[in-house]
């Protein structure tokens, strides 16, 4: 009898889990647009460049706690993020041109 009760307990637990999963599925999911994602990525690139510029200014002014290796790392991060942004732009332009050249 205890095995049956154990199985019934597991079944009721699975049913409760399924009910909560259905309840979560019915909640409206936030939608993020492509333009919103692109704008957020551009903001992150801008923030990275601003942080690198600020670090470089602090190092140039001789503020304590700002090491050259940190400045160089931040500058490289900014450079890589900018190059990534340029490559994404190039791919988007190429995709747009390909779509526009398609025959309807």
Swiss-Prot record:
It comes from the Bacteria. GO terms for cellular component: bacterial-type flagellum basal body. GO terms for molecular function: cytoskeletal motor activity; structural molecule activity. InterPro entries: FliE. It is found in: Bacterial flagellum basal body. One of its GO terms (biological process) is bacterial-type flagellum-dependent cell motility. Keywords: Bacterial flagellum. Belongs to the FliE family. This is Flagellar hook-basal body complex protein FliE. It comes from Escherichia coli O139:H28 (strain E24377A / ETEC). The lineage of its organism: Bacteria, Pseudomonadati, Pseudomonadota, Gammaproteobacteria, Enterobacterales.
